[in-house]
Amino acid sequence: MEKLTIAQIKKMLTEEISSEQLAELKLDERKGVQLAIKSYEKRLKKIENEKLEFQNRLKIERDLWDKGIEYIAGVDEVGRGPLAGPVVTAAVILPHDFDVFEVNDSKQLSEKKREELYKKILEKAVAVSVGLSDNNLIDEVNIYEATRLAMKQAIESLNITPQKIIVDAMTIDTKIPQLRLIKGDAKSASVAAASIVAKVTRDHLMQFYARIYPGYGFEKNDGYGTKQHLEGLENKGVTPIHRQSFEPVKKILLK
């Protein structure tokens, strides 16, 4: 290999290289090169670990596929805790060859990574759907029941009827056999994919609401009770998307 500059080597190491190329680079004693190699190997190790963890998250699906259960829907929700906006759910059926190893619990991912994976899930999944319960329904039936209704809506909106449902920590009112899995978004790839779809969908909705109702910081807090949000409630009052059964919204309405 012709003598390269450190900058050229760093650029080269942004992509995967052959073991022969790596061995040759290791002969270069320049400190900058050795640091670049160390960083490269650390990144490869991280990817290797992520792939292994992903295979573990696919174990439940793989076991069911081996039993002839073809269509398995992972179901998850986001938005049970905020003071404003809907609770959003998603249902995702993954193909047997799904290999997007970075798909994980949405809470473990950056906004940029979630957006990137959201597009890949929509592109590669067998079926994807979302369900939604708005703040009025939440106030009418309570957040738990509203979440269950949104999950049922997501399942019924799939263009393929699943043979099995894996749901994160809840049960859905359906005759389809279901597996209730505590922390399912960290244990099942299908549920993890659903958590990403639900989160990105709700984030987009809250960004839309932020333009309609400025001054509450919905684009940053997603409707949660941050300082800016609480100050907005005090100064501007309650919006049509606030959950009136939630404190301190309820208290403000009584003033």
Curated annotation (Swiss-Prot):
Coiled coil: none annotated. It catalyses: Endonucleolytic cleavage to 5'-phosphomonoester. InterPro entries: RNase_HII, RNase_HII/HIII, RNase_HII/HIII_dom, RNaseH-like_sf, RNaseH_sf. A divalent metal cation binds at D76, E77, D168. The keyword Nuclease applies. GO terms for biological process: DNA replication, removal of RNA primer; mismatch repair. Its EC number is 3.1.26.4. This is Ribonuclease HII. It comes from Ligilactobacillus salivarius (strain UCC118) (Lactobacillus salivarius). The lineage of its organism: Bacteria, Bacillati, Bacillota, Bacilli, Lactobacillales. The gene is rnhB.
